[in-house]
Amino acid sequence: MARLDHNPGRETAGMLTGPLCLDRRGFVLASLASLAASPAMGARGPIRVLIVDGVSNHDWRLTTRLLLKILESTGLFAVSISTSPPKADAPGWDQWRPDFESCDVVLQTYNDIWGGPAWPERVKSAFETFVARGGGVFFLHSANNAFADWPAYNEMIGLGWREKDFGRAIYIDDDERQAVIPAGVGEGTDHGPRYDALVRRIGEHPVHEGLPRAWMTADVELYRYARGPACQLEVLSYAREPQTRMNWPMEWTVMYGRGRCYVANYGHVWDGDKDPVTLRSVDVQTILIRALQWLARREVTWPVPEDYPTAETVSIRPALP
């Protein structure tokens, strides 16, 4: 767990807690984290993954196809998809009810930024209940752009694509301590061109057990100044961003009630991308599978492959068939 040190703008590496970490009812979220050791849902058989898609400023159709191929190739997952209507005035919203309770983990790629439709209130409520009771959620790349006006969602992602006054940002200092940038200081969330980044992991999280301390990831779009409540948040890895020359989180986890949330910067698939490198990267595929195991409260058993990237070289697999 993190502790505040003598500099109020810094916190030690670990989970961010403290007086600012209150939910909208005024209760400290840390009190809920103690409930996290609840029994696993669907502890036997394949891990049930529900991909939620249908709207995004990214290519969600290609993203879903590639995710399906990666997950189905492992034999570990039973994957279903819930696709929303495409626009706010499209038919079908009254009937759209993702069956969160039938899955172990939601793989969330939906993104309403740029005026896309928000989820109906009944879907939001069902999602909140699913996570608070112990469900897992994997927020892939632009999923943390979504739902800026939804308080519970902001708590789940911890940090998202937000204006600079929205909340605090987190960076990693040169001693690998999590440091806080207050709301209104610095910039709103942004990114530079995609690049091959040196990722450094922090600590010994189960998702990263057995991985090298550092490796190259290919063609990543790293967010700088991601902002939010950042409560019950633990940064798992980071990379140096060329423009700011600062270390920004690459992956992080958040506890929401009994639920586990995992947020990833990688996975950018833009309209017009063909065989996007990021989802062919060995590190991204490996961590995706291992994170889903952890989110489902299973033992993380997926092995570290021999072709895992090194600190000097990316590792890219052939285009998925």
Locations of regions flagged by a protein language model:
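Extracellular ligand-binding/catalytic regions of CAZymes and related secreted enzymes
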Residues: 45-47, 62, 73, 242-250, ...
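Helical hinge/lid and interdomain linker segments adjacent to catalytic or ligand-binding clefts
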Residues: 22, 48-51, 56, 60-147
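N-terminal secretory signal peptides and thylakoid transit peptides that target proteins
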Residues: 11-34
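Short, solvent-exposed loop/turn segments at secondary-structure junctions
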Residues: 56-57, 112-113, 144-146, 213, ...
